[in-house]
Amino acid sequence: MTINALLLSSSRVGDTPYLAHAIPFIKPLTTNAQKWIFIPYAGVSMSYDTYLASVVTGLSELELDISGIHQHPDPQQAIKDADGILIGGGNTFHLLHQLYRYDLVTLIGEQVALGKPYIGWSAGSNVSGLSIRTTNDMPIIEPPSFKALNLVPFQLNPHYSNYQAPGHNGETRAQRLLEFTKVDPLTPVVGIVEGSALWRQGDKLSLLGDQPAYLFCGEQQEIPIPVGSDLSHLLKA
């Protein structure tokens, strides 16, 4: 079996309905996977039931059987029994903290390595990389480790934008990622813009959507990655 992982920048693009833009990206991963487990642990400002309901509604046209991991007495068994794994956005630190709390980090990696499809957006994409050291989120809770699922051997930065509001004097996203590359010059970071996604199929990695991505690694800063690029070389990082 090979890894089949879709890493979405966001749950929306512009003013589109929740997950609507992602349906064409998600659909190919559901061909042989009907029963999905949704992990809502990144959702801090809403109940898990409310979060689950929004995902079920957003993906309703795919007619999937989606349950929340919080509805199962044994989270590990729920992962094993599912045909696919969905992890939504929110706070990445809280998400990873809960994944460690229920001892799911290694298990999810093992299940995806065996071919179980994985779909994440925002925080759910952040945790798919080597670590969560390039998340945009506030560290509201301290997980046991920043090490993440390692579904791809590099760092991700979802919602990438280097926009700076006039008169605002805080760091831009590019400046923050530059800081990471100064500390760790050998690990690539891919900034994925809202509306786009990375899709790993075994040894192949593709950029989906109509927006470029951006690469940061060592002295390479904010290098545009053209729409439709093959990024398979990053899997050898």
UniProtKB/Swiss-Prot annotation:
Q: Which Gene3D superfamilies match?
A: 3.40.50.880
Record's family? Belongs to the peptidase S51 family.
One BP annotation, GO: proteolysis
Give the EC class as a word.
hydrolase
Gene coding for it = pepE
Question: Which organism is this protein's natural source?
Answer: Shewanella baltica (strain OS223)
Q: Pfam families attached here?
A: Peptidase_S51
Show the catalytic activity.
Dipeptidase E catalyzes the hydrolysis of dipeptides Asp-|-Xaa. It does not act on peptides with N-terminal Glu, Asn or Gln, nor does it cleave isoaspartyl peptides
Q: What is its main location?
A: cytoplasm
Q: What is its EC number?
A: 3.4.13.21
- What protein is this chain from? Peptidase E
